Every structure is written in structure tokens, then in C-alpha cells.
Amino acid sequence: MSKVSGAGEEKLKVLALHGYRQNADSFKSKLGSFRKMLNKYVEFVFVSAPHPAAPLEAVGGEPDPNQRSWWFNKDDRTFKGTNQGGPAYGFDESLRLVERTWQAEGCHGLLGFSQGACFVGLLCDLSARGMTTMKPQFAVVASGFRSGSLVHLNYYENKVQIPSLHIFGETDEIITKDMSEALAETFLDPEVVTHPGGHYFPAQASLKETYVDFFRDQLQQHLEAKELQNATEENSFHLEGQEEAEESALQPVHEGLQNGSDSDSD
């Protein structure tokens, strides 16, 4: 059985999806302490959403290329987590980008914050229904919520059956506690971690053990599954070789019988 050990061993690759009006670089920076906690077990892959978001100061003004959005759920091409019954402009383009990145990087799991966490929930559901090439082994969801876009309302009919860690603040006023709890309930056996703060990704020392335990468990499961797959493929290879050898051994006998039959006919 494979065991998680020290530096130099295989790590998990986790695709990290930022929140609304963030980008890959800003999210990577915000997760600095979190990444440091998990450096032994995880390599994070960051990608920016394809759509420029309207600047916070002047909605309707010129988009800031550094502020990005995975999709827009309002007709003015902005996004708000509490919006219900709206569109999902740009979602398909973001889905294709994330699928390409996942494939190119060889990722194992997903992590998301806020809008990115909402996206993670949708991706996990799509994967469970075989509607994406992505097959995440686990998910980490911070300040997540269910999408209220009309095209996403049927995404939550069946519970997602992969390990998941859900993190949210007791006093979050942007994505409230009940919104994050509603997303957690769409997973079969969610692990829930709360903190007393608001809308941010917590990385205080008191949570280190929880984070390390979760990712160490996922790495252990990944290594064991990989070991089992390798053993199965090796066994299949040996069986095929044995069958070919047996067929080769029988071939001269068949030829001899055929030759004997020809002689008798003469």
C-alpha cells in the first residue's frame, strides 16, 4: 500500500477557481498562507476567468481587465450571488476553458471561492452526470452557494458523491451561511468547517490540522487508487501474454493434425 511521505513524493494537483472580480494572480496571492500549509501535499493550478468584469466603482463603466468573471447572471452583464432566475452569460466559454486547463495540467481536484466555489459545485454535478470530460476526485468549496441562473436550476437534483470540504464564515454578509449550507447539502457526505469571520478564505493556524488532514486523506486515496490501477493493468498484461503463449504452444499440434489428415486423404 502506498503511503504519503515527505518531500519529493507525488502531490495532488488542484485547479483553483477565483471569485467574482478576482483573477488567477490575486487569488494565488490571497491563498499564500493556505498554500504554504499544504505545500507538502498539493500543487495548485490557477486560471483566470475569460470575461472582464465591470469595475466595482462604476457598474456600466469600462471593464477592468484585471477583474474577471466566470459568467454573468444579470442582464447588465454583472454578477450577484443572491440573484435568482437570471441568465448565465458566458458560462459555456468558461466551462471550455476550465476543461482545457484541467486536461492540460492533469488535475485531480477542484477548489473554489465564492463565484468560483459556485462553479465548482456545478462542475461536480456535470461530472457526476457524465456531461464534462473532467473527473474531480474531491472538491474544496469556500463561501460557496447554489447558482440561481435558470439554466442551472436542474443541476442539483442528485447528490454529488465525492469527498468535499465546505468552508464559510458565520458572519458573511455577501454569501450568507444558509447559502453555503444549501450548497453543502448537494454533496452526499460534506465536511463542513465554519469560522467566525466574513467573506474570505480563512487560513488561520487553528484550521491547519483540518486542511492538512483533508488533503492528506485525498492524496492517500489517490495513491492507493493509482497503485490498484497499475496492478490491474500489469495483471491484465501478464494474462494476455500467457494466453498468447498457450496459443503458440498449441499451434504446432494443430498443424500436425492437419498434416496427418492430408496424408490420410492421399
UniProtKB/Swiss-Prot annotation:
Catalytic activity, EC: 3.1.2.-
Class in the EC hierarchy, top level: hydrolase
Sequence segments annotated as region (Disordered): 231-266
Cellular component terms per the entry's GO annotation: cytoplasm; nucleus
Residues at the catalytic site: 114 (charge relay system), 172 (charge relay system), 199 (charge relay system)
Listed name of the protein: Esterase AGAP003155
Keywords: Hydrolase
InterPro entries documented for this protein: AB_hydrolase_fold, FSH-like_dom, LovG
Superkingdom, taxonomy of origin: Eukaryota
UniProt GO molecular function: hydrolase activity
Lineage of source species: Eukaryota, Metazoa, Ecdysozoa, Arthropoda, Hexapoda
UniProt record similarity statement: Belongs to the LovG family.
